[in-house]
Amino acid sequence: MNWLEKGPVKVAILDLYEGKANQGMRCIRTILHDWAGSNDLELQVTEYDVRLRNELPDTSYDIYISSGGPGDPLISRFDDWDIAWGRWLDKMTRWNQNPSTTRKKYIFFICHSFQLACRYFNAGLVCKRKSTAFGVFPIHMLEAGKDEPV
């Protein structure tokens, strides 16, 4: 995608931190600001409080970033926010699978969101860790992802 084709790049940040103190949201904002600056892009960024306010974006954005957050994705399956997040992901998936859609929607899932997405797509078994962990864990690309532009 040529980001310069159509004015500002619209970015939706889905905040799953549930109002808890974190470094994730600050880092996401910084990375976006730096990326826009180094590519001479104008950004329109909107943040959505998914867990406390049940806020979710529509399909008008170019990029979606769904954050990490506290808690256990194994036990939130029946929480209102988790159900709404799954419906949002279903809407985004249907958008991208529609053959008449010319501009696909790109979603970056971070930590907690990545686990929710794995659960949604049945892409792996989400299970408890052996111990508390922080940092980067390896992920492996699925065969279908090798042809994706992002």
Residue ranges of predicted features:
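N-terminal beta1-alpha1 cap of cysteine-dependent amidohydrolase-like domains
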Residues: M1-N98
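Residue-level detector of short, conserved catalytic/binding motifs and their immediate flanks
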Residues: V9, K105, F137
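Short secondary-structure capping/junction motifs at helix and strand boundaries
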Residues: E42, S100-K105, V126-C127, E148
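Structural signal for conserved beta-strand scaffold positions within catalytic alpha/beta enzyme cores
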Residues: I13, E47-D49, F109, C127-K128, ...
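Catalytic nucleophile loop
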Residues: N96-F121
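Short, flexible active-site-adjacent loop segments at beta-strand->alpha-helix junctions, enriched
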Residues: P70, S113-F114, G145
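Short, amphipathic alpha-helical segments
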Residues: D79-I83, C111, K130-A133
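Pocket-forming structural segment of enzyme catalytic cores
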Residues: N122-V150
